[in-house]
């Protein structure tokens, strides 16, 4: 017996109304993905699936696909598991066995996994080169502290500053309780 897949747009709208740390950015995530016909989204960090649903609803509308990575195998139990527009890889986002399974070209890169400075730098090094010209990298939680990081610092912000300085790039921070960093890959 096949379990029916959820109505992704309805699920997305419900999650936009539900309390979560990403709620204020869900319309933006969805909107960015809707900019690209045949959108290719690479998401690191699924957790409860709020961002995943925003991207999947856009991918369904745009004829695209979402690849998600998370270390938590419980992500296999999401209602949209089996959706033809979703590929999930369970594992460490920077392990070669995981990075090798991800698409080589993406329009939207979303990082919201481990928020330690070094891990974010490693994810940017592994995945930002896959962002196509005109594409975007979005990094959630630019305004949170992380265990093991120096007091008074925001590790995602520090990683963005370091990566962009090394690469000759610029990033912007969108306001909000948790912060969202944006890097646009120039043409």
PLM region descriptions:
Residues 1-110, 114-187:
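A short alpha-helical cap/connector motif
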């Amino acid at each position: 017996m096949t379990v029916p897949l959820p109505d992704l747009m309805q699920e997305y709208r419900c999650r936009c109304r539900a309390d979560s740390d990403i709620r204020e950015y869900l319309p933006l995530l969805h909107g960015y993905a809707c900019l690209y016909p045949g959108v290719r989204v690479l998401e690191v960090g699924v957790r409860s699936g709020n961002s995943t649903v925003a991207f999947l609803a856009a991918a369904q509308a745009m004829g695209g696909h979402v690849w998600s990575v998370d270390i938590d195998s419980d992500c296999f139990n999401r209602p949209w598991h089996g959706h033809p527009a979703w590929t999930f890889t369970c594992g460490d986002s920077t392990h070669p066995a995981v990075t090798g399974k991800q698409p080589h070209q993406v329009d939207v890169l979303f990082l919201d996994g481990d928020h330690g400075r070094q891990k974010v730098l490693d994810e940017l090094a592994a995945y930002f080169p896959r962002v196509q010209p005109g594409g975007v990298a979005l990094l959630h939680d630019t305004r949170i502290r992380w265990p093991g990081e120096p007091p008074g610092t925001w590790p995602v912000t520090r990683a963005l500053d370091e990566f962009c300085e090394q690469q000759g790039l610029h990033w912007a921070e969108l306001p909000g309780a948790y912060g969202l960093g944006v890097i646009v890959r120039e043409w």
